[in-house]
Amino acid sequence: KVEAIIREEMDGLGAQEILMSSLQPKENWLQTNRWDAMDVLFKIPSQTKKEYALGPTHEEIVTPLVKAFVSSYKSLPVAVYQIQTKFRDELRAKSGVLRGREFVMKDLYSFHLTQADLELFYQKAMQTYLQVFARCGLQTKVVEASGGAFTKKFSHEFQVLTDAGEDKILTSPSWMYGQNSEVATLEEGDACPDHPEEKLEWRKGVEVGNIFDLGSKFAEAFDLAVTNEAGERQPVLMGCYGIGVSRLVGTIVEACHDERGIIWPKNVAPYQVELISLRSKDEAMQARISEVALGLYEDLMKQGIEVLWDDRANASPGEKFADADLIGLPLRLVVSEKMLKENSVEWKERVKLEAQMVKLEDVVEMVGEFVSS
């Protein structure tokens, strides 16, 4: 579901989805002088004595790829993206999917004739990223950071404030921006630039995305140039834009939980509804519970509503409720002997403490409204 949101937003940005090789020739990395410069590069020897890198990023592949298709300024701008497994030889792989040596990433690359066009796309990409994260139920800060191995310019990170984070971010509660500790020019206790009544403070954050203005660095390495309107050859300008997809899922959990378990935002919940049927010692009542639960399940599924049905016969009500809170789907419906005597089901939203009774004949319509709201 996270990937579907990303694809929607990338397509809306005018980017085309492709899929590139994870195995990358050493020669490409030598051309950009990054074979020895990037310390997280997995290097793989082949039986033919050739060396390859397991892709941590794809500038070395996408640049010569675009070169094969673009020769005129009339073909620009171009934007391509992929969602693919990446590999980085992290010294401190930890925290599950938040920092691993193998992870899923969406990487977008844009190619432009002029700096003005690149900057325009860069700003559009920034707004699109904010939209992606908002749709995933997250509040993010746009944070100035170092360009690292990608560029000497500053980059922008998208940080989610959580104690599970490794990055130090200087920001304030109402400020949508911030500065990474690597490049901070402001200090703790300074007045917030946009909200002077608030003081800046250091917070921990998880980086869920980043965007870079690459300039002509990679284009020059691969001689990616086009003939401009004046008939002159000029290097193409590039931007790259990443979202850690698997890290994003882990960050949603870190940001959206309580002591009982996960609280999935509606847009990315694995299912929209958890249906629980409780056992009855009375045979006729048990048959009625099963009949009503099955009917509800089928009616909701027909409406396109995703339902996880806990019909385990060997689990107690307490176990089922605890597991429902742990899994954290947005809505829990309970069919039980007590409820059916009232011709009702129990309705409990994961974000609320209190449950309520809803008449059987109203349930499907109410669930539809809840899911779409």
Q: In which residue ranges do the predicted regions lie?
A:
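NTP/phosphate- and nucleic-acid-binding module
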Residues: 1-373
